[in-house]
């Protein structure tokens, strides 16, 4: 079963910039741990680590 999850930038708050968020899906049965992906943050103008939030 696919579940909608939100990925949030981990570096933006440290630098005082707005956070960037992405929506993606994951399969709850096969992927039990939280997702971490490198995605582009337009506020920082570079790729940063984005982690799944609840």
Swiss-Prot record:
One GO cellular component, as annotated: cytoplasm
Primary gene name: rpmG
Gene3D superfamilies for this protein: Ribosomal protein L33
GO biological processes: translation
The keyword Transferase is assigned to this record: no
Species lineage: Bacteria, Pseudomonadati, Verrucomicrobiota, Opitutia, Opitutales
UniProt organism field: Opitutus terrae (strain DSM 11246 / JCM 15787 / PB90-1)
Taxonomic superkingdom: Bacteria
Record-level Gene Ontology MF annotations: structural constituent of ribosome
Protein name from the UniProt record: Large ribosomal subunit protein bL33
Transmembrane segments annotated in the record for this chain: none
UniProt keywords, alphabetically: Ribonucleoprotein, Ribosomal protein
Record bears the keyword Ribonucleoprotein: yes
Family assignment from sequence similarity: Belongs to the bacterial ribosomal protein bL33 family.
